[in-house]
């Protein structure tokens, strides 16, 4: 049995909370939790705590919510906890160099990709969008760069043809805690072997934007279908019709060529709404008009068939 480590945990969303939960079930001691300030949520815009804060409070762990860790006062909060290591998972704040070196074993991060591929804010979505065959998690020793630290452990999983960002998120939320606990065991026993990243192989996962979710019919059907899966559950791919956005939750690729202008509706029936692209045909299967719930193509056609007349061009 390796030594029990004093751990500071820093994270905010559900993905992070699943890692904190694993730590709470381990032999290690979580001595403090750093998480982002409460945010307005819901129709009433009431301040709501994130999943990590809720879990920490349920377990009587001290919670700290600074807007930044740049001030000496907030850095002293970290130092006073006298931690062996700081575990960072989707925290959302940059750690200054002074904080990175405070714990005896430094700070480690769980990142949702196989580094150095997809450094940055949206690795899960970008791996899907790019058509990668696999992804995974990397546990790394943090340094001052953006996801550039030495790698301590990598765990991989395949990306299937029907994975969405939501399903991939769940897969990585199971892999991550496994890798984290194994890495902490290695660190505690002094047997961790850091591996340098090859910067020449690095790619960057830029943050998603709502504008980017608009379907560009000049892409191939395969690219658009991946885009739809990558942007599910947020921000959700869409096209415009009658100056209204229509979200697309599910689509499939028909591997035959059309010589119609990209965006042209070729057919519309109970199997879906078929749209021409630069390469192949995209079959829209689950859609959501503004103000409505997601529905099948057939249900949408029952109420809005005039939107999808063959020969019309979608914006």
UniProtKB/Swiss-Prot annotation:
Assigned keywords, A-Z: Protein biosynthesis, Transferase
GO molecular function, one term: methionyl-tRNA formyltransferase activity
Reactions accelerated catalytically: L-methionyl-tRNA(fMet) + (6R)-10-formyltetrahydrofolate = N-formyl-L-methionyl-tRNA(fMet) + (6S)-5,6,7,8-tetrahydrofolate + H(+)
The name this protein goes by in its record: Methionyl-tRNA formyltransferase
Enzyme class, broadest EC rank: transferase
N-terminal signal peptide: none
GO cellular component, one term: cytosol
E.C. no: 2.1.2.9
Pfam families: Formyl_trans_C, Formyl_trans_N
Keyword Transferase: yes
Record flagged with keyword Transferase: yes
């Amino acid at each position: 049995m390796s030594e029990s480590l004093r751990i500071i945990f820093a994270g905010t969303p559900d993905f992070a909370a699943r890692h904190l939960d694993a730590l709470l079930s381990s032999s290690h001691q979580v001595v403090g939790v750093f998480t982002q300030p409460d945010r307005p949520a819901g129709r009433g815009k009431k301040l709501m705590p994130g999943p990590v804060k809720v879990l920490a409070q349920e377990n009587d762990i001290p919670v700290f919510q600074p807007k930044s860790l740049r001030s000496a006062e907030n850095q002293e909060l970290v130092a006073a906890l006298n931690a062996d290591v700081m575990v960072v998972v989707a925290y959302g704040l940059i750690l200054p160099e002074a904080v990175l070196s405070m714990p005896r074993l430094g700070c480690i991060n769980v990142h949702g990709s196989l580094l150095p591929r997809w450094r940055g804010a949206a690795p899960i979505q970008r791996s899907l969008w790019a058509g990668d065959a696999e992804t995974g998690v990397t546990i790394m020793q943090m340094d001052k760069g953006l996801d550039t630290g030495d790698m301590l452990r990598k765990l991989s999983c395949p990306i299937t043809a029907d994975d969405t960002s939501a399903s991939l998120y769940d897969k990585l939320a199971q892999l991550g805690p496994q890798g984290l606990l194994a890495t902490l065991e290695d660190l505690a026993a002094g047997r961790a072997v850091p591996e340098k990243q090859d910067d020449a192989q690095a790619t960057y996962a830029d943050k998603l934007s709502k504008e980017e979710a608009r379907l560009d019919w000049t892409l191939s059907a395969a690219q658009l279908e991946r885009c739809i899966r990558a942007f599910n559950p947020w921000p959700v791919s869409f096209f415009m019709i009658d100056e209204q956005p229509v979200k697309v939750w599910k689509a499939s690729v028909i591997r035959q060529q059309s010589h119609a202008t990209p965006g042209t509706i070729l057919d519309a029936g109970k199997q879906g709404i078929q749209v021409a692209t630069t390469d192949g045909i995209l079959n829209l299967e689950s859609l959501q008009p503004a103000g409505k719930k997601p529905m099948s193509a057939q249900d949408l056609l029952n109420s809005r068939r005039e939107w999808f007349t063959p020969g019309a061009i979608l914006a």
